[in-house]
Amino acid sequence: GIEQPDFFNAPPLARNPRDFWGRRWNLWFTQTTHRLIFQPLGGVQRPVFAASGVFVFSALMHEYMVMVSLGRFDGRMIVFFLLHGVATILFTVFSKSLGQTISLPRPVAVSIHFVWFIATAPLFFGPIDDIFALREWSWTLLFSVAMGWV
């Protein structure tokens, strides 16, 4: 048979946006968009342009799924993915300008990234909550599933 990659690699342990999106979250999607979007748009020769293309594609794809499900334009998915795209690109550009990846102690880096993710999570999980009409406990459940805790 065809070997399938793991979908997640301990997302709560991500140290930065690039680590989260490139090595820990939805690895099948990451590998697919790397091959079909990132590389054709210039890959490592044009990383800002190529990464922007991946995040714009992801934003539009997620927003389309929300729009079809809710029957209206929402916009939160677009904002979520554009914010995360900018954060990932800024982290990468800043690291390259230093000549190395920004290196903080693991607990500090993980905590900073976790706070960033929690701060932006309503933009991602809010539309999902609206689609499934989940209330009260839904944020905890959705976040726990997304983080691989359930």
Model-flagged regions — what are they?
Residues G1-M67, Q100-V150:
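Membrane-interfacial catalytic/cofactor-binding modules of polytopic membrane enzymes
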Residues L90-S95, F125:
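Structural signal for the C-terminal ends of transmembrane alpha-helices
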Residues V66-M77:
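Interfacial helix-loop-helix junctions of multi-pass membrane proteins
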Residues L82-F91, E136-S144:
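Alpha-helical transmembrane segments and their membrane-interface exit regions
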Residues G75, V79-L83, L104-V108:
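Short amphipathic alpha-helix initiation/capping segments at coil-to-helix junctions
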